[in-house]
Amino acid sequence: ISLFHGFFEYDIVNDKITRKLDLPIPEANKDMALGDHVLNSGHHGIALSGDDQTICVAGTMDGYIAIVDRATFEYKTIPLSDNPKEAKPYWATSSKDGTKAYVSISGLDKVSVVDYATGKIVAEVPVGNHPQRVRNGQLRLK
């Protein structure tokens, strides 16, 4: 499913796919050659909110962040640039308290902070060249 623009819900106990969500492909990307997908990914990063109710998807090749209601699969997209091939959101990780998602925007050299409750970007942090994976950490000072 590497080149898929969306995701599947999978029942581990019964070993079957229970639902599939196709997320939108911008018009500019509909004729994209398979070899033009970064790391063979349509959408790459995915995170789940702390209450397990909301999913954040990094639409890597589509230039948006998707916020998805886990129960209904209804979603909204947050466009990151006028050119869907420019932003390249790459990874999504939930905050330690589970209320926000951190999404690395590799093509724009920043990390966006998305509030799960509102589905809006609440902060953007400029970072070094081409951020990829995002992790929570703790700095201990003596």
Regions inferred by a protein language model and the residue ranges of each:
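Predominantly soluble domains enriched in secretory-pathway, periplasmic, or organellar proteins
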Residues: 1-142
